């Protein structure tokens, strides 16, 4: 690839990455503060508002740290020291883990909420908010422990010349590790993500069954001439299933890009594509939640109307 093409590709990647970050930060900020207001303004706040607020907060942290990483990739002159590199990459990895945990537990909570009276999950209904909140805090602590090796694996490399280092930004790179350590950390990450993906798939299967039963009931009501309007539970279930499907597609695509990067030894283009793909869920999911929540759309419309009339 010649110099002009390389510059053109870098410009496209830069615009795409910063657009994704800025739009995602704005959307997640709106989502977080809206659900925070719902939590504080209701006499009996719904647990779903807490989980969506937690998800939007972790996604906000993820996108902010990604924005700082992107700034060091394209704008800065590689002036970070080792402490800055370690702190930022560690916080970014934690935010990614927290986001995965929050998305998974949101699926599990909704599965428990929609469980029938005959289901074994019914006994968890009343205590599920406490159990899931406790599980989220436990997972946060575990992520902090599992990601602690990053503090020793990342250094500042302003004048990177060795091929043994793995590029992260202009300032930061991963130290080369022995095969046993690499295998151990890779296995830990693979097991962790397989567990969460499996749990999300299980809960999604339950939600699909719920939608199927609801559709049969709607067809029966339609045949008898009664109203078959979609319930709030059905709309929320469809939203979560849509997000789950989108998450799985992005997860598969991210892994394809990652292995392509390793195979072709590409240090820039595939790496940028991988970053963009891996953070797309944090941006898109916030818009899905915003535009499927009637209360939020009404608030946004009223705000836009006031701005236009000023």
From Swiss-Prot:
It holds the Pfam family V1R. It comes from the Eukaryota. Residues 1-20, 81-93, 156-193, 260-269 are extracellular. It is found in: Cell membrane. Expressed in 1-4% of neurons of the vomeronasal organ. Only one pheromone receptor gene may be expressed in a particular neuron. Not expressed in the main olfactory epithelium. PANTHER family: VOMERONASAL TYPE-1 RECEPTOR. Putative pheromone receptor implicated in the regulation of social as well as reproductive behavior. This is Vomeronasal type-1 receptor 93. The gene is Vom1r93.
């Amino acid at each position: 690839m010649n110099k002009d093409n390389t510059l053109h590709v870098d410009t496209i990647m830069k615009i795409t990455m910063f657009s994704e970050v800025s739009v995602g930060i704005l959307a997640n900020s709106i989502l977080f503060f809206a659900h925070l207001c719902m939590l504080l303004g209701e006499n009996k706040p719904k647990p779903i508002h807490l989980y969506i607020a937690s998800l939007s907060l972790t996604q906000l942290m993820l996108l902010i740290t990604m924005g700082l990483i992107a700034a060091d990739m394209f704008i800065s002159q590689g002036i970070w020291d080792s402490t800055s590199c370690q702190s930022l990459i560690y916080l970014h990895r934690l935010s990614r883990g927290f986001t995965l945990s929050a998305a998974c537990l949101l699926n599990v909570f909704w599965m428990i909420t929609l469980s029938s009276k005959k289901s074994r999950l019914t006994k968890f209904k009343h205590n599920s908010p406490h159990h899931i909140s406790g599980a989220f805090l436990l997972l946060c602590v575990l992520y902090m422990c599992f990601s602690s090796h990053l503090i020793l694996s990342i250094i500042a490399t302003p004048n990177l010349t060795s091929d043994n280092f793995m590029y992260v930004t202009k300032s930061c790179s991963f130290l080369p590790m022995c095969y046993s350590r690499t295998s151990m950390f890779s296995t830990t990450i693979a097991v962790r993500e397989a567990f969460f993906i499996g749990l999300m798939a299980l809960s999604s299967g339950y939600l699909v069954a719920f939608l199927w039963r609801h559709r049969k009931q709607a067809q029966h009501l339609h045949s008898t001439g009664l109203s078959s309007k979609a319930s709030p539970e059905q709309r929320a279930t469809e939203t979560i299933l849509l997000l789950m499907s989108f998450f799985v597609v992005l997860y598969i695509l991210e892994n394809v890009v990652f292995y392509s990067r390793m195979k072709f030894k590409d240090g820039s283009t595939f790496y940028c594509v991988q970053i963009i793909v891996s953070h797309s869920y944090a941006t898109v999911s916030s818009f899905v939640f915003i535009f499927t929540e009637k209360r939020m759309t009404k608030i946004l419309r009223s705000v836009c109307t006031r701005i236009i009339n000023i």
